[in-house]
Amino acid sequence: LILYHFRQEARLSTDCFIFPTSIAATESDIIVCIDDVMMSGGTAQRFFYQNQEDFAEKKIYYLALLSSNEALSKLQELNIKVIPCAVLDERNRVFSEESLCFFKYPALKETAKIMVEGYGKIIEPKKALGHMDGQYCFGFSYNIPNNSLPIFWSSSNGWNPIFCRKEKYQNAKQAKREYGFFI
């Protein structure tokens, strides 16, 4: 969805865009990847490792609406130029020492953390405060990152989220297993 809007605003032809499986066949010396959020950097890092041969001799740019310093560092180590619109830091993590979320009501912070973490452990035991302890509190109209608090998005263990999270399909086989009757 974000790529569609980017293409429309930049008035770019669909010919300028390729599927990841076509990277090796492209003659371009420059590859630009566009993403909404890059918080832990793990997904982007795995993508580049999986396509390392295809990226050889190419200049790689990674555009992201939101990124963390951790994710920036991971990709810069791979010689990838990362261009984020905004970099989130400890101030954006709900329960960090530097968090801006409770600056007006600091006395509520510990009580809120106990409640959020308590429910989080029930609905997402391995990521009670979000993937990689994200502690973020944001989402988009089309999806919500798993780094955000799971009390907002998880539907595990009978929880009814206020926002539905749609998992990404990592490959065509995974999508076909779930939606094969449509294909």
Located regions from the model:
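Structural motif
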Residues: I30-V32, Y61
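Active-site metal-binding loops of divalent metal-dependent hydrolases
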Residues: D35-V37
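Short, glycine/charge-rich flexible loops or terminal/linker lids adjacent to PRPP-binding catalytic cores
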Residues: L1-D29, M39-R46
